[in-house]
Every structure is written in structure tokens, then in C-alpha cells.
Design a protein with these regions (language model features):
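AMP-binding/adenylate-forming catalytic core of the ANL superfamily
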Residues: 90, 107, 361, 371, ...
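Non-catalytic C-terminal accessory region of glycerolipid acyltransferases
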Residues: 470, 516, 722-824
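Conserved ATP-dependent adenylate/AMP-binding module captured primarily in the ANL superfamily
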Residues: 88-116, 133-137, 177-194, 226-240
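Conserved AMP-binding/adenylate-forming
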Residues: 242, 283-408, 414-417, 431-432, ...
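Conserved pre-ATP/AMP-binding loop-to-beta segment of ANL
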Residues: 16-19, 138-156, 163, 186-192
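Conserved C-terminal "lid"/linker of ANL adenylate-forming enzymes
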Residues: 445-448, 478-530
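Conserved AMP-binding/adenylation subdomain of ANL enzymes
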Residues: 175-192, 199-289
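Conserved AMP-binding/adenylate-forming core of the ANL superfamily
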Residues: 21-66, 70-74, 91-96, 145, ...
Length: 824
């Protein structure tokens, strides 16, 4: 196996019906089996070939993670094209340079990319339009002859403001690492991998896409990095492994520890952590079983790479009974060079080279690498390529050593490159060039200033020409930089000049030593207003930033003034949700957001209501068996006596496979049991019905009774209906069909009432067959306002199923469904 096309075809043949990709975003659910994925990738390749992509042509891919991103990526590769993936946070200036270098024939973008950032010189297709384009054009895929040595990707290692370098990776580079990883990492067809990291980066592609696909695992993509969302998905999906960077590991651990503190169990937590290292892993999992329940109960191990991992943080996770498998690599090695394995790992190291991977240590301590995973050079940059290789060895620019057991110890970087805790690379010279253009600044040196927990921040040390306006100069410069390049703090250098070498280069290590010895580099901020929301927020911001509350004001920029990077902001938003019951997503924050901006957002957002509880027990085996028994011996005979039922249109159910959304008019309390009786033979007990939360579930005893008899769940008729809709998505995702009454309440006279708009939203976003049902006669048997039924005939008419097109207007969808019921 030498190409991604061969790998994907083999996976489709071996694991065809298994789930390959899945993502839930709001009420939209995307799922693809391996067979679906192979077919969609081929169709996409044909579409791209129709749009002018030939073998070796470059295609820009600029979008957030999603199954559509994966399909587009694979479509380019199996069609013979070369993918140029871009980070969603790339600046327009950087993208323009990449476009100029690679000359792509097409750009595949998400509509979420700001319009001002898009390049007008390249034809654009939007990933959101991909399903529609595939249906409309029905392109025929022409299989090109692809070899292992053919170029697969040109990856630009993060955004730089200088001349970016494109790393050329072949199909064989990618496949070799995937094959090697399969021997080292225990992923199999029963694994469920959660992919959080941006797929525009090679580590995420390896650990969150290619490696799981090669093993037949299921990959779950997540649109949010907030711990609350992450933990919900871990529980709901039964996730077995996650690939993370150290900062995300710390983010989740901090979330867990805050919960421990709120429960008043901090002393017990510390005692258990002191005890755990002496115990076997199985016993540790029992000791921390409550944490494992919170993490879904299925987590087997975590993968960590992309940046330095503090051994003390790794030990915390190991103490929980969750192994941390570290690795070392970079874009130029198609992700991985060394690996930990489940049974051979050593804290403080980054693993061992697998068989076939050559690692040497140069006399000066530099790590040298050779193997089939090493890139072939930089795109159209022979000089940079030549400087990177020495006698066939790739010079990593990293320092380290191999111990007697072959474990690699990473000691630091030989070059000036800054690697942030989220795995993003920052080139100091690029930021320095921008800062040095400002008239207020004589010269700037950008360094990685150490913070607590082994983290670093991008910090500028400045020789000033205009001390009064230096802060404004830094702020203005930040507007030109990508989010990971932001200067998080700065220091005015007190001397006349920086320490320099005899060739006048700044001695960065001496500058860093001076800063490390100083006690504090901060200026006073304006006082915080006394409103409670501001006071609460100031406390939480101070906690995340590690600063005194009095140093934080409404004009404090979260990045520049407080040193918060993107993941620190995610942690802050998580803390706000936990402590203030207000949910804010990253996307709601403006660029260069200040504390005042966040205060304004919080003031406009309603506090979260108590979450609606949807118990799992009605879907359990015991409840389902009891339900079938009660329906057959009690409910069905009673209905047969009260309302002899004629059923029309059963043939419309024959061609429906999988879950469906049943919609019916609502005239009586008997509507649900009658419909369930009609559908029982075909759908058994895998059918759930919505019932008015305020009517049936206000009394717990009554709510539990109808949950048992009819597998009913509460649906809010007033207020926030979103939790209920998300529960419906959960049911459909698990293969259940759902019955709802779109009128929202019983008709007082038997006439069809206008439908609530939510049914259109559900029908469009779920993407499953919608089956209309017309009930006649029940209004005479048990009308609204009566509890004493009268015997009478009933007719149930089942209409033909329909699927609503993705992207259809919800109001129009609702109107169409109402018309379907009226026609019956």
C-alpha cells in the first residue's frame, strides 16, 4: 500500500458498513460509513476533475473540521491533486502569499471564512454546497495513475508574516507513518476516536483522520473545544481515545479539578493522587471511577503531541488510570518520529523510534531523522531544502538525547522557533519585522516567555523610540497578525541596547534570563465598575490569567494585556458557564476582544435554565420488554375495544430503512397509543413519542408511567425547546424513530391547527424520511377536555415519506409538511 487512495479503498472493502465519520453541529447530524466515504470521495474527485483539477494541480482547502472537510481532502488526493490545507485563523496576507506560491486551480472554502479574507484570483467552491453540487453535476470519476512518490500535500507550518515555506509530503510519506502508527498505537475497528485538533495540521491528520481510518475506527468531530461540550460527547459517544495537545489536557484536568473543589473533596483528591502511582492501572480506574463516569467510562488512552508536555500533568492523568501516549515529530516528518506504546512508555520522554525509523543525535545535540516519512523538500525553495538536509539526514533543529533504552529525551529548540502549548508554531523574526516597522519602536526581540505548567507566551522585548505610545504600537501590530502570533505581553528594555554577539545578533537567551529574573512586568489598569456581573467576571479572568483582580480593567485586551491564548479563552468561557450559568461561544468574541467586550456580551445573554433531564431507562432492555408486554396485554386490547382502527397506507413504510420522523395531527390523548399500536409490528419498541412537558411530566409519577408505556419524553411547548430537539437528534443518532405532533397541542374542534416552526427545522436538519400521518375519529372517542372515552371507529392514514432538501428554508419546510397532512 503506497497511496491514500489504496488505503481508503481497502478500508471501504474491509469495513464498508461500519461508521467512519460523524459530527453533530446544532441539530445537524452528519454520518458516513466507510462505504459512503469511499463513494463520496470518488464523486468529489470527479467533480474536481470537471472543475479543472488534473494530476499534480494544487487545491486550496480552507475550512473548519467537518466530515465535508475530510471528503474534500480525500477527493483531491484520490483524484491526483495536491491538497494545500490552511488553518482557519490564517490571515489574508498569509493566504495571498500561499496562493502566489502554489498557484491553485481551485479553492475549497467554508462560508464561515470571512469574505474579506477570500482570494478573488482563484475559483471558489464552498464545502457547504458540496452535497448539492454532487447531486446536480453527477460527475464521472476518472481514476488517475498515482504512485507513492507523487506529491499529496503542501503544508505550510502555521502562519508566518515572512515568506512561508511549504512542506512537500508524498503519498508514501503519509502512508508509511499510518502503517507504522498502526503497529504502535492500539486503535482497532471497535475504537471511537474524538478529533479536536485542526485538520490543517499534520498531527491532527495523522491522529484524528488517517490512522483511525486505516484501522477501521469511527471518528467523531466536534465543533467546540469547551470542556462541558467535550465531556458530553465523551459520554454520549463512548469515546475510547482522543488526540490532544498539552494545553487541552490541562484544560480538561482543570475543569475536573474545579468540580472536585466545588464538591469540597480537594483533600481526598490529593490523597488519592498520592496513593494512585503505587497501584496497578486497573485499580486506579476503580479508585477514580467517578471521574471515568464523567469522561464517558470508555476512555482507554490519550494521545498527546505537538508541544512539550509537563511530566507532572502527564502523571495526573496516569494516576487516574488513563495512559498518556506521547510522541515526537513535525510537519517535515509527516507527523511522527517517536512513539510511546501502551506497555512501553516513560514519563519525561517522547517515546522510542519504531522499526525502520532512524534517529541520530549530532555532536552538538541536534536530533537528526531519516526514513520514509521524511518530506522531499520545501515547495519551490531549493535553498531552504538544501540547508535542512545533511548527508541524507533531516536536521530537525531540536536538541535531545537517546537514553540507553532508546527513549528520546527532548531538550529544547536549537532554532528560534516558538512552539505554543496548543502545538502552533510561531516564527519570532516575522513578528519582529512587523514591530520594527512601527516608528514608536527602535527594535524588538520576540521570545517565548515561560509561564506556569511549562507553558510559554509570545512576549516582545522592546527598545522604544516613543515610550508614550508603545502599547498602542503593539496593539496595532497585533491587528496584522494571526491569532496564534499575537504578542501576549511586552517589556520595555531598560538598557541602551540589547546584548549582542560580535556579528551584532541579539543574544536572545541573555534577554530571556533578564526577564526571568524580574519580579513583575505589568502596568496598572483602570478600576472595574462595581456591577455584579463585572465583579464576577473580573474574578474569573484573574483566575485564568494568574493576575491580581485590580490589574484587570474593561479595556484590558484578553490577548495582549492578559496573556490569554485561544485555549485559555476557551477555559475562561468554560469557567463562566460553570460559575455564572451563562454560555458564550468563541465565535461570539470580536478580534482583539477586551474584558469590556466580554462584559457586554454577558449582559445581553440570558442565564442558562436548569437542564431538562431525559432519562435513559425507558430505552433500556428491561423497559422495552415491559413496554411490549403491557402494550399487547393491556393497551392494545383496550384500544381494540374503544376504537376499532382502519389503517391505510401501510405500504408507504416498506421502503423506509433506518429511523424516520413521524408527524401526526393531534386531536386526542389517545393519538399516541393508537399510532404506536399501528407502528408496533414494524418498529417494535424503537419508537419514541414527544409529550407536553408541562402537562404530562409536571407530575413525576405520571411522567414515569407514560415514559414506560409509550417511551414518551418531555417536549417544551413554551420557552427553550432546544434541549428537546437535541434529544430528538440523540434518539435518531441511536437508530430510534420519533413521533411528534407539530400543532403543539390538541385541536379543540378536530380541525388541523397551524404547525410550529420547529418541525421544519427538525425535518431539514435530521435528513431522515418524514412520514405524515392523518388521524380521524379520535376526536369523537376522547375529545379535548374529556376524560371519559366513547366507543367509535378510527382511521389512520399513512402518507408517502418525503425527504426535505438540505438548506431548505425552515418556514417553507413547515408549510410543506402541513400541506402533506391536509392532503391525506
Amino acid at each position: 500500500m503506497d497511496t491514500i487512495s489504496q488505503m481508503l479503498e481497502e478500508a471501504a472493502q474491509e469495513h464498508g458498513p461500519r461508521l467512519a465519520l460523524k459530527m453533530r453541529k446544532g441539530l445537524c447530524l452528519e454520518k458516513y460509513t466507510y462505504k459512503d466515504l469511499w463513494r463520496k470521495a470518488q464523486c468529489t474527485a470527479g467533480l474536481l476533475q470537471n472543475r479543472g483539477m488534473e494530476k499534480g494541480e494544487r487545491v486550496l482547502l480552507w475550512a473548519p473540521n467537518s466530515p465535508s472537510w475530510v471528503i474534500a481532502y480525500l477527493g483531491v488526493l484520490i483524484g491526483g491533486g495536491v491538497v494545500v490545507p490552511l488553518d482557519v485563523q490564517s490571515t489574508p496576507h498569509f493566504v495571498a502569499k500561499v496562493v502566489a506560491q502554489t498557484e491553485p486551480v481551485l479553492a475549497l472554502l467554508s462560508t464561515s471564512i470571512p469574505e474579506a479574507a477570500r482570494t478573488p484570483s482563484v475559483p471558489i467552491a464552498y464545502l457547504e454546497d458540496l452535497p448539492h453540487l454532487l447531486r446536480r453535476e453527477k460527475a464521472v470519476f476518472q481514476q488517475p495513475q498515482i504512485q507513492g512518490q507523487d506529491l499529496a500535500e503542501i503544508m505550510y507550518t502555521s502562519g508566518t508574516t515572512g515568506e512561508p515555506k511549504g512542506v512537500m509530503l508524498t503519498h508514501r510519506n503519509l502512508v508509511y507513518n499510518v502503517e507504522t502508527g498502526r503497529q504502535m498505537i492500539p486503535v482497532n475497528p471497535d475504537s471511537k476516536a474524538l478529533s479536536l485538533l485542526p485538520l490543517s495540521h499534520i498531527y491532527a491528520q495523522f491522529a484524528g483522520l488517517l490512522s483511525p481510518l486505516h484501522c477501521g475506527a469511527s471518528i467523531i468531530y466536534l465543533p467546540s473545544r469547551q470542556p462541558n461540550t467535550l465531556l458530553r460527547v465523551l459520554r454520549r459517544e463512548g469515546i475510547t481515545t482522543v488526540a490532544l495537545v498539552p494545553q487541552l489536557l490541562q484544560l480538561i484536568m482543570s475543569h475536573i479539578e474545579r468540580g472536585v473543589e466545588r464538591r469540597g473533596a480537594a483533600d481526598l483528591w490529593r490523597f488519592m493522587h498520592r496513593l494512585a502511582p503505587r497501584l496497578p492501572m486497573t485499580v486506579r480506574r476503580i479508585l477514580f471511577r467517578s471521574v471515568h463516569r464523567e469522561l464517558g467510562g470508555c476512555l482507554q488512552f490519550l494521545l498527546c503531541g505537538g508541544a512539550y508536555l509537563d511530566p507532572s500533568l502527564a502523571q495526573k492523568w496516569e494516576s487516574l488510570g488513563i495512559p498518556i501516549l506521547q510522541g515526537y515529530g513535525m510537519t517535515e516528518t509527516a507527523a511522527m518520529v517517536t512513539y510511546d506504546t501502551l506497555y512501553h512508555r516513560r514519563l519525561g520522554t517522547v517515546g522510542r523510534p519504531p522499526p525502520g525509523q532512524q534517529v541520530e543525535i549530532a555532536p552538538d545535540g541536534e536530533i537528526l531523522v531519516r526514513g520514509e516519512n521524511v518530506f522531499i523538500g520545501y515547495w519551490r525553495n531549493a535553498n531552504a531544502t538544501k540547508q535542512t538536509f545533511r548527508d541524507g539526514w533531516y536536521c530537525t533543529g531540536d536538541l535531545g538525547y537517546l537514553d540507553s533504552d532508546g527513549y528520546l529525551h527532548f531538550k529544547g529548540r536549537k532554532k528560534n522557533l516558538i512552539v505554543l502549548a496548543d502545538g502552533m508554531n510561531v516564527y519570532p523574526e516575522d513578528i519582529e519585522n512587523c514591530l520594527n516597522l512601527r516608528p514608536e519602536i527602535k527594535e524588538a526581540v520576540v521570545i517565548d516567555l515561560p509561564k506556569n505548567g511549562g507553558l510559554v507566551e509570545v512576549h516582545a522585548v522592546i527598545l522604544v523610540a516613543d515610550p508614550e505610545n508603545v502599547e498602542q504600537a503593539v496593539r496595532e501590530t497585533n491587528r496584522l497578525l494571526a491569532s496564534h502570533q499575537q504578542v501576549r505581553g511586552f517589556t520595555v528594555w531598560s538598557g541602551e541596547d540589547f546584548p549582542r554577539t560580535h556579528t551584532l545578533k541579539v543574544k536572545r537567551h541573555e534577554v530571556l534570563d533578564v526577564l526571568a529574573a524580574a519580579d513583575k512586568f505589568a502596568e496598572e489598569q483602570p478600576e472595574i465598575p462595581s456591577r455584579q456581573i463585572d465583579s464576577d467576571l473580573r474574578h474569573l479572568v484573574a483566575k485564568i490569567a494568574g493576575l491580581p483582580r485590580e490589574d484587570i480593567g474593561p479595556q484590558s485586551v484578553l490577548g495582549l494585556d492578559l496573556g490569554l491564548d485561544s485555549l485559555s479563552i476557551v477555559e475562561l468561557l468554560c469557567l463562566i458557564e460553570e460559575e455564572m450559568s451563562i454560555s458564550v461561544e468563541e465565535g461570539q468574541l470580536p478580534a482583539q476582544a477586551t474584558v469590556g467586550d466580554l462584559e457586554a456580551i454577558l449582559a445581553d445573554v440570558e442565564r442558562l435554565e436548569e437542564p431538562t433531564i431525559f432519562p435513559d431507562w425507558p430505552a433500556g432492555l428491561a423497559a422495552r420488554a415491559t413496554r411490549i408486554l403491557l402494550q399487547r396485554v393491556l393497551v392494545d386490547p383496550l384500544l381494540a375495544f374503544l376504537c376499532p382502527t382502519q389503517v391505510k397506507g401501510l405500504e408507504n413504510l416498506v421502503d423506509i430503512s433506518g429511523p424516520a420522523l413521524f408527524i401526526a395531527n393531534h386531536t386526542s390523548h389517545l393519538d399516541t397509543p393508537v399510532v404506536l399500536k399501528v407502528l408496533l409490528r414494524r418498529y417494535g419498541s424503537r419508537l419514541s413519542a414527544a409529550a407536553a412537558a408541562d402537562y404530562w411530566f409536571a407530575n413525576p409519577l405520571l411522567g414515569n408511567l407514560i415514559a414506560l408505556l409509550f417511551n414518551a419524553f418531555p417536549m417544551a411547548r413554551q420557552g427553550n425547546a432546544r434541549p428537546c430537539m437535541e434529544h430528538i437528534v440523540d434518539l435518531v443518532d441511536r437508530g430510534w424513530s420519533v413521533l411528534i405532533f407539530p400543532e403543539g397541542t390538541r385541536s379543540p374542534n378536530g380541525e388541523l391547527q397551524p404547525f410550529k416552526a420547529g418541525v421544519g427545522l427538525l425535518a431539514v436538519e435530521l435528513g431522515i424520511p418524514v412520514v405524515p400521518i392523518k388521524l380521524s375519529g379520535l376526536q369523537q372517542v376522547l375529545p379535548k377536555g374529556s376524560w371519559l372515552p366513547r366507543r367509535g371507529p378510527v382511521t389512520v392514514t399513512i402518507g408517502a415519506s418525503l425527504r426535505l432538501l438540505p438548506g431548505m428554508d425552515y418556514v417553507q419546510a413547515t408549510q410543506q409538511l402541513e400541506r402533506e397532512i391536509r392532503r391525506l
